[in-house]
Structures are given as C-alpha cells and as structure tokens.
C-alpha cells in the first residue's frame, strides 16, 4: 500500500 511498505 505505502511506497515504503515493509509490513507496517
């Protein structure tokens, strides 16, 4: 979802 999606 977020461009920096690391699982947050």
Swiss-Prot record:
- Give the keywords, sorted: Amidation, Neuropeptide, Secreted
Q: What is its main location?
A: secreted
- Tissue occurrence: Brain, subesophageal ganglion, retrocerebral complex, thoracico-abdominal ganglion, peripheral neurosecretory system and intestine.
**One GO location term (cellular component):** extracellular region
Q: Write down the superkingdom of origin.
A: Eukaryota
For this chain's UniProt record, which GO biological process terms are given? neuropeptide signaling pathway
- Spell out the subcellular localization from the entry: Secreted
State which residue ranges cross the membrane: none
In the record, Leucine amide modifications are located at: 8
Family classification: Belongs to the allatostatin family.
Q: What does this protein do?
A: May act as a neurotransmitter or neuromodulator and play a role in the integration of information within the brain. May be involved in the control of visceral muscles due to its ability to behave as potent inhibitors of peristaltic movements. May also fulfill a neurohormonal role on muscles of the gut and heart.
Q: What is this protein called?
A: Callatostatin-4
Q: What is the lineage of its organism?
A: Eukaryota, Metazoa, Ecdysozoa, Arthropoda, Hexapoda
């Amino acid at each position: 979802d977020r461009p920096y999606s690391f699982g947050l």
